Amino acid sequence: MFTLRPNQALVADDILLDGRLALFHQSERWLAVADLHFGYELSQRAAGALVPMWGMASIRDRLLQLVEEYRPARLVILGDLVHDRTAVVEARTLLEQLRQVCEPIVVAGNHDRHVRGRIEFLDSWETDCFHFHHGHCAVEASDRIQIIGHHHPAATISDGAGLRLKCPAFVQQSGCWIMPAFSPWAGGVQWARDEESRVWLCTPERILRLPEAQPVSA
């Protein structure tokens, strides 16, 4: 029997959420991530901002670590592979590295529009039960669960004494799952919890399922 670590959670039959911001299907052997925004620091430097050159290395190392650990047949990148065209060469190099160990499936996001002629993208990808797309465009209703990115969900916990910690979150709703942003530069958008949302707060060392919002009494 598979033993879960503190940074893993079973969020559905055969599906693991990893606190390093990835989703893995154990029997179908796909690993999904979203919103890498690869090359964000290059984009900011080109615009004159003095930001450290550590984001791309962090993304690459974490991806390769996840792929080595889970051994997926396919790595599904759910849009916004790059932040803009500044890092297209570096992004292509990353994909070549990944192709040595699995099949990258790169779904197009809104930030990818300027590099679609230089990197191969899909508008969406499907399995029997899941429909993967970025989430920035409306799609036709389907009996498959949608798995999307784009929204950069985050959640906040506090100790009751004034300390508050905001972390990336994975959100499950009926018919739609929203991935946290994989980019270390993504601050995340506080997710407005409701009765329909199951929210998992993600850190590299631990995953916490937040209490579900209670219905408002009349």
Please tell me what each predicted stretch does:
Residues 1-78, 82-218:
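Extended recognition/assembly regions associated with phosphoester-bond processing machinery
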